[in-house]
Amino acid sequence: MTNETIASQLAHRTIRAYKDQPLTEAEVTTLMDVARHTATSSFLQSCTILHITDPKVREAIGAASGQPYVGGTKGDLFIFVADLYRNSRIRAEQGVSSEALSSINLFLTALEDALLAAQNVVVAAESMGLGTVYLGSILADPRPVVKALELPELTFPVVGLLVGHADQDPGQKPRMPLSVVTAKNTYPRVESYTETLADYDREVTEYYDLRSGSRLESFTHLVATNIGVGGAHVSPIMEVLHEQGLCLR
């Protein structure tokens, strides 16, 4: 069973190279309107999206991320912010304490709002024939990002997103089989993931082998060696959350 929307989602690829062709004002407005109509936890609408058009701000974000293409001029850059500040102001203006907004529970609702909005924008952008790439790398060094965006207390940059006209045609990265990532009712127990994923490991190795790089590895090897070594894995995220007045209880 398929339709145009499903076909677009199943064809998702990460695009890191873009043409020097900014989105039109109408395209940006459409994508932001899609984000605005995304489902939101408890109708609190705890997300703000920043469209980065200032070259200096973008360069600062690019430097913090460690990804050269983030700080350039190609593709439009959006930052999805978990935003409890706006609701704290609304409460203050009505004489209500905002202490509850510093809880991890409320941060998780804002985090969900931001991520759902980002994914809705990706689906919409790809349906328009545009390319996208998520930028979790903005959290490799979150303090400069918070500073560059002039984020107030009770806000946090959750994820970045580049959207634009693709200047590359990469292959689609294989995913684990449905039998591994889905189950009915209760969590599945697997005796050996290494054995279960053997065919998938070969598929991933072949994918990297066919690319124009020297990287050769399987999925299970990636999991065994890559977690905890990249910038985003050792970033002081919890410290910055606390500095922003978030997740204090």
Model region roles, listed by residue range:
Residues 1-249:
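Acidic, surface-exposed loops and disordered segments
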